[in-house]
Every structure is written in structure tokens, then in C-alpha cells.
Amino acid sequence: MGALLELQGVTAGYGGGDILHELDLGVEDGAITCIVGPNGAGKSTVLRVVSGLLRPRLGQVRFRGSSIGGLSPRAILHRGIVQVPQERSLFPTMTVWENVRMGAYTVHDRPLVDRRLQAVCETFPIVRERRLEPAASLSGGQQKIVEFARALMLDPALLVLDEPSMGLDPKTRTIVFDTIRAMNQAGRTILLVEQNARSGLGLASHGVVMESGRVRLEGLGSAVLNNPEIGHLYLGATA
């Protein structure tokens, strides 16, 4: 499989200060790519560039071989990149069913929406089981899974997850990561940023360690996880 997403020599930042410095990064089609690193490494900035919320000052961002670095977030969404934010984003007073259906707000083909909803229910049983309950009645981990379901209503080519385990207890984090693994096994390409390096790299087929806006180390997730060069810097603090 080839690269679905490529960042080539990307420099980007805010207010005249660069956070990313000539960054090269690739996401292979069909892979789980996990970015880890200390606070301030530029992980979230990468996701902002990929989703169109921040335009690079230098370099190229290519998706399926086409440049997307100058596109709006909406245009990038239409290209097939869908992001699930770190913050809880469900509408608390709306039902689970209503929240999930809203994921297809750009799809005007009602039969297609119904088919996707059926597929989502098969993948995420909680959507059917709790469909009439308000989103606020769900636990943090359950809400995160419903957010995944909502994102899949757009059938993204690339699913981008910003720290999906943030604020979750270890048991719930395991459930969420098992769900991410299942989505990937079903054919979904996933790019995630994860503060918990052990969990993220243990899940990933490709691991990337960032520091000061650059890629410091990358390779197979398991190899990066066990590399002594980064263990004392990242893993001890984020386990």
C-alpha cells in the first residue's frame, strides 16, 4: 500500500512563530499511524494542518496525490478526511440516534444515509441499544465511541483522532482502543495523536515520535515503543 497522506517539508505555526519545522510525515493507506511526543512537540498542530484549520507557511500537504494545503476545512472534509476532536462534541440533550445521524449532514441521499446508519449500528451496537437516550446519559468512553460512529457516517478515507483516550480510566481506555483497532481491521485508515505513548504505540502499525516540531523517530509501532532512545523521555511520563 502507498501513502494516503503526505506532509513534505511542512513549516507552520501561529502569529509568526513556527511550531512545525520542515516536517516530513506519511500515513500509509490501511494503517494506524500514531503520533506521540511531549507537550509542545507539535502533535496537535499536525492535525490542524491536515484538517485545514492551519495553512502551512512552507511545504506540501498531499492527500491521495493531490495538494490540499490551501483548502478550507469543509473542502478537506469533502475530500474524505474526518476528525474527531479531543473535546467531547456530542449534543448532550439530543439522542444518540440524532447525534449519529448529524454526522451525515453533508449527505443528501436519504437511502445512502440509512444504509450507513445501519452499518454503523452493526459496528457500534451501543448506537442501537442507546439510540433514544440523550447523549448526556452516556459515560465518557461511551460518548467517545458514539463520536466515532458519527464520524463514520461520512465514510471517511482517513479518520483523524485527537487524543481519544484523554480523561478516560484505564479500563475505558482499553475499550476505546479496542474500538479503534476494530475500525482499522474493517479497512479504515487512522491517524491519531495520543498523549499515552504506551497505549498509542502499542496500537499503531506505524509510530511517530515528535519533538520540537520535527520527527525524531519513526517506524513500526512496537519497535518505536521499545526503543530505549525515547523510553526515558516519553513513556515513563505518559504510561
Predicted regions and their residues:
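The feature captures the beta-strand-to-loop junction immediately N-terminal to the Walker
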Residues: 36-38
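Conserved ABC ATPase signature
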Residues: 134-138
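Conserved ABC transporter NBD signature motif
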Residues: 59-68, 79, 112-117, 217-219
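Helix-to-loop junction immediately C-terminal to a conserved catalytic motif
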Residues: 51
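Catalytic Walker B motif of ABC-type/P-loop ATPase nucleotide-binding domains
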Residues: 159-163
